Amino acid sequence: MSLRFTNSLTSRTEAFEPLTEGKASIYCCGVTVYDLCHLGHARSYINWDVLRRYLIWRGYDVTYIQNYTDIDDKILNRANEEGITMQAVSERNIEAFEVDMGRLNILPADRMPRATGCIEGIQTLISELESKGAAYSSDGDVYFDISKAKNYGKLSGRDPDDQQQGASGRTADGEESRKRHPFDFALWKGAKAGEPSWESPWGPGRPGWHIECSAMVRQELGQTIDIHLGGGDLVFPHHENEIAQSETANGTTLAKLWMHNGMVNVGGTKMSKSLGNFTTIRALLDSGISPMTLRLFVLQAHYRKPLDFTAEALEAAATGWKGLNAALSLGGRHGESLGWSTAAPLAEGAMNADGGPADTALVELEQRFISAMDDDLNSSGGLAVLFDLAKPLRSLANRLERGEDAALPELELKGLEGRWQLLRHLAAVLGLRSEAEAAPSLDDGAIDVAIAARKAAKAAKDFAEADRIRDELAAQGVELIDKPGGVTEWIRA
């Protein structure tokens, strides 16, 4: 089976055929940094982290861009509430986001542009739309005229003839009266007293929400990309409007493939800050829920399906992770006494190199994993393979933990070692890492050496080795926090 994903644009599962063979350009809509992130954000970024890891593992050269929306009404409102600047609110929440993502073992994007760093590109894009008659000024604002877009509504299925007020999303007071059509949306908002603003051909002001992503996609990846990612709540209006303005300006397709994750529900209702039914990532992790339990909880469901958040479901994930972790940490805890190699996990295909492993069942298990993940990123199917691999390893781990003699025939031990190697190899593809009991902590110099080695592994796109180094540090009570620009900070957990 070829690698296939469900395209939100066509509602069909399609073979992945990138613009350039062997490469994948991906843009993921990032957070609006006005508050801490909740479990819904965790779900989205865990899913897309696995997509990225899997594509890399399958041999693709992936360029992954994720933005920060750091100018928005929500940020301005929070700044006014707290009596601080918009920048202070943004910086605080960007830092918190990066810490949360690091704890969840989510790889940092290759680049993380900010809307405020793309003002020139935004203004250029608006000018191009204006020159094509697709933008108009109204009382200090500039709006996109949806009648100039081809097939507006093709992503969401919305009909522009539906005269729904506020349809463009994030509308300001009185904005509807300044628009020609309810679906028209702001490209540039005229300056208001006390708000940050930038000079422009239309007077001082700031960008609208949708134009920011269109400009950052073009700035970072060009006019057409392979995959555009986001939550299902962004299909309309945000992604619909991105398509309209980008394709009108550029005259070409914005993204070949659109992928959207399902929502996290609480009591049958979408988790959201506006409804007040959310739980932050930080609160969950600080309450004692392990990061890998949270990852497992998310990956047990297909990324497109709704995910019900209940105490029972989280407890079940914790139980599942306890067993999986026992198997994953077996080599680290007892590998030396068993004579096992604790080198980095093998690359894809290495399990059947040179005629294949002694146990052909491992080849079949790896192929089951690939078949599941190739089928629209079926992470629950991938996890099933991990649990199958883990069963005999858990039994051995339990015997060793009880101090029982683990004397086994050499061939059987060798087979279990191969099973463990494949388990941690595939677990790394899903971003799952063992959480061993903390050993005596390293000194600062040793930590710095390990971080340098991990940085070199990441530069070589050897993420399995990078994860192995992170795991070893975590086992010794050192937590790494990756930040944009290749910077890694650490704390003693």
UniProtKB/Swiss-Prot annotation:
GO molecular function: ATP binding; cysteine-tRNA ligase activity; zinc ion binding
Record localization: Cytoplasm
PANTHER family: CYSTEINE--TRNA LIGASE, CYTOPLASMIC, CYSTEINYL-TRNA SYNTHETASE
Protein name as annotated: Cysteine--tRNA ligase
Family that this chain belongs to: Belongs to the class-I aminoacyl-tRNA synthetase family.
Gene Ontology terms: biological process: cysteinyl-tRNA aminoacylation
SMART domains: DALR_2
Position of sequence motif 'KMSKS' region: 270-274
Cofactor notes: Binds 1 zinc ion per subunit.
InterPro entries attached to this UniProt entry: Cys-tRNA-ligase, Cys-tRNA-synt_Ia_DALR, Cys-tRNA/MSH_ligase, Rossmann-like_a/b/a_fold, tRNA-synt_1_cat_dom, tRNAsynth_Ia_anticodon-bd
Renumbered residue ranges of the record's region Disordered: 154-179
Catalytic activity: tRNA(Cys) + L-cysteine + ATP = L-cysteinyl-tRNA(Cys) + AMP + diphosphate
Pfam families: DALR_2, tRNA-synt_1e
Keywords assigned: Aminoacyl-tRNA synthetase, ATP-binding, Cytoplasm, Ligase, Metal-binding, Nucleotide-binding, Protein biosynthesis, Zinc
Source taxon at top rank: Bacteria
Binding locations of Zn(2+): 29, 213, 238, 242
Main location: cytoplasm
